[in-house]
Regions:
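N-terminal leader/targeting segments and the immediately adjacent pre-domain N-terminus
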Residues: 16-119, 147, 176, 180, ...
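Structured C-terminal helix/loop/strand segments within mature extracytoplasmic catalytic/sensor domains
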Residues: 21-34, 352-401
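Active-site-proximal alpha-helical segments within enzyme catalytic domains
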Residues: 234-241, 285-306, 358-374
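Active-site SXXK
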Residues: 107, 125-150, 174, 238-242, ...
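Catalytic-site signature segments of enzymes, centered on catalytic residues
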Residues: 114, 120-121, 186-188, 196-275
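Active-site-proximal loop and beta-strand segments within enzyme catalytic domains
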Residues: 78-92, 108, 119-121, 141-227
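Active-site helix/loop module of the DD-peptidase/beta-lactamase fold
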Residues: 125, 144-186, 219, 244-284, ...
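Active-site Gly/Thr loop motif
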Residues: 264-272, 318-369
Length: 401
């Protein structure tokens, strides 16, 4: 199976393969199997850099005038301690299966590292960092009056959710992962879990959207607003609310409201979560961008929504989305959760987090943004070590403040 997939991946990612497209390029057995193997631990360093050759996409157009970030000429080095052992930067990069690392401090790039064949033009999958992007778009739509209130019920914008698990839930509930919908987010895609069912039908076989599942099959488990339950389904429904409220494709709205005015350097793109004729942006986990543009996005949020001299995102929204009262998400889970941003205990720091250890880590106290793009064998579990590294970077800058 691995040999067959390697051969398929090579053919998919080669320039010659793009010249001979079949009549239905996204639903051939080869393409379906390619999407089915995207998390393969021996090849995810490659697939995570080439999602547009495995999935149907929608492009988010960049600015013609990029936001220039000065680059520090001095070499960057840092060490950190984890579980009683101290590691150098190079050891961290290898130990945590790093594809790319960017560190911005005081509006300047102080470290920019590419690995595993990637470069400044590579567009990396965000996985669930996309939730923080979708939240940002919701905030902009709210400021424009396209969404009247985040306390509006989901069914006001998506009447097809009447009678589903989302009836009675509000936009705020979805932003905070408290919809009350019965959903179990377990990343074992070879086992018959709820997430596997929706993932395989939406992202692999292209049979229906995440929002189709939400409307037709979701069920209520708890009262909305009462219990934190991390859910890519909630974030996907948020994206469907967004596109319905603004009356535009999500990619076009993002280009117009964020990617162009913020001075992003290169086009980004969303992978699609359904069949080609009706599929739309996979708002829960499907954005792709360059390392620097992820850094620009994090820097914009650090700046209170400001980018290259322009106020792109309302500052009040940024404060609400990333701050507030820190409340742990559960027993043994010290991180909190605001509007699709994770918060850090005893700190003003917050972060966007994606599967297989993708991070945009923002520390307001030291004016630092860290982007870490990975291809770890395990989908989750290494966050404590990453937080130890981020803490060491922040401590390094705190000494120079």
């Amino acid at each position: 199976m691995l040999f067959a997939f390697v051969a398929a991946a090579i053919s998919l990612l080669s320039p010659c393969a793009a010249t001979a497209q079949p009549s239905s390029p996204w639903t051939t057995p080869t393409m379906i199997e390619g999407r089915n193997q995207v998390f393969h631990p021996g090849l995810n360093f490659l697939t995570f850099q080439h999602m547009d050759q495995l999935f149907a996409t929608r492009v988010v157009r960049a600015s013609g005038k990029p936001w220039i970030l000065p680059k520090e000429q001095e070499s960057f080095d840092v060490s950190y301690t984890y579980e009683g052992k101290t590691y150098a930067l190079d050891q961290f990069l290898e130990k945590t299966s790093t594809n790319a690392l960017l560190v911005i401090n005081n509006q300047r790039i102080v470290a920019e590292i590419y690995r595993n064949g990637s470069n400044e033009e590579t567009r990396f999958i965000s996985w669930s960092m996309a939730k923080s992007i979708t939240s940002t778009l919701i905030g902009i739509a709210l400021s424009e009056g396209k969404i009247e209130s985040i306390d509006d019920p989901v069914t006001k914008y998506l009447p097809e959710m009447e009678g589903s698990g989302y009836q009675g839930a509000t936009i705020r509930h979805l932003l905070m992962m408290r919809s009350g919908v019965d959903w179990l987010e377990i990343y074992r895609f070879k086992e018959p879990t709820q997430l596997t069912e929706v993932h395989d039908n939406s992202l692999v076989a292209y049979k229906y959207r995440f929002c189709d599942y939400a409307a037709k099959q979701s069920m209520r488990k708890t009262a909305p607003g009462t219990e934190f339950n991390y859910s890519t389904l909630d974030a996907s429904v948020l994206g469907c609310i967004l596109e319905r409220a603004v009356g535009m494709k999500g990619a076009d709205y993002m280009a117009e409201k964020v990617w162009k005015p913020a001075g992003m350097e290169r086009d980004g793109y969303w992978i699609m979560d359904g069949p080609p004729e009706v599929g739309r942006e996979f708002f829960g986990a499907g954005f792709n961008a360059t390392l620097r543009d992820y850094g620009r996005f994090g820097l914009m949020i650090l700046n209170g929504g400001g980018a290259d001299g322009k106020q792109v995102v309302p500052i009040d929204w940024v404060k609400q989305a990333t701050g507030g009262v820190h409340e742990p998400t559960g027993p043994g889970r010290p991180t909190g959760y605001q509007y699709d941003w994770w918060t850090i205990p005893d700190s003003k720091a917050f972060m966007a987090v994606g599967l297989h250890h993708q991070f945009i880590y923002v520390d307001p106290d030291t004016h630092t943004v860290i982007v870490k793009l990975s291809a770890t064998p395990k989908p989750v579990g290494d966050q404590p070590e990453h937080l130890a590294f981020f803490g060491a970077v922040v401590a390094k800058f705190a000494k120079t403040q």
